[in-house]
Amino acid sequence: MKVLVIFAVLSLVIFSNCSAETDEDFFGEESFEADDIIPFIAKEQVRSDCTLRNHDCTDDRHSCCRSKMFKDVCTCFYPSQRSETARAKKELCTCQQPKHLKYIEKGLQKAKDYATG
């Protein structure tokens, strides 16, 4: 019985791969044009109304700026219990770069500097 189930799943996978659209069908001239996507990419890169790093993004959490490679993330936290704003339990959010992305960016920059010079 197990062999029959495995054979059925395998044949279904093979059939679906054979009948799927090929890359030529998907990237044909009529279905995909690079001119359609370029304005969206340009708009994201030139976004001037973004929130700078370590600035408040509480009201608009998707407004953080980009660094050289990655977009900063709006990180939220509650202030310490000693401060007056903590008594109001107000959440504060700032645009920050996650540490792993910071290390990746620095490592790639050092590799690029090493390769070029």
Curated annotation (Swiss-Prot):
Keywords: Amidation, Cytolysis, Disulfide bond, Membrane, Neurotoxin, Secreted, Signal, Target cell membrane, Target membrane, Toxin. Residues 21-47, 82-87 form a propeptide. Disulfide bonds join 50-65, 57-74, 64-95, 76-93. Its main location: secreted. Expressed by the venom gland. The keyword Cytoplasm does not apply. The modification Threonine amide is found at residue 116. It comes from the Eukaryota. Pfam families: Toxin_35 (PF10530). PROSITE patterns: SPIDER_CSTX. GO terms for cellular component: extracellular region; membrane; other organism cell membrane. Residues 1-20 form the signal peptide. InterPro entries: Spider_toxin_CSTX_knottin (IPR019553), Spider_toxin_CSTX_Knottin_CS (IPR011142). GO terms for molecular function: toxin activity. It is found in: Secreted; Target cell membrane. GO terms for biological process: killing of cells of another organism. Synergistic toxin that induces or increases a cytolytic effect when combined with CSTX-1 (AC P81694) or CSTX-9 (AC P58604). When alone, has a weak insecticidal activity, with an unknown molecular target. Belongs to the neurotoxin 19 (CSTX) family. 12 subfamily. The presence of a 'disulfide through disulfide knot' structurally defines this protein as a knottin. Negative results: does not show effect on 18 ion channels: Kv1.1, Kv1.2, Kv1.3, Kv1.4, Kv1.5, Kv1.6, Kv2.1, Kv3.1, Kv4.2, Kv4.3, Shaker IR, hERG, Nav1.2, Nav1.4, Nav1.5, Nav1.6, DmNaV1, and Cav3.3 (when tested at 500 nM on channels expressed in oocytes). Heterodimer of A and B chains; disulfide-linked. Interacts with CSTX-1 (AC P81694) (Kd=430 nM), and with CSTX-9 (AC P58604) (Kd=370 nM). This is Neurotoxic enhancer CSTX-13.
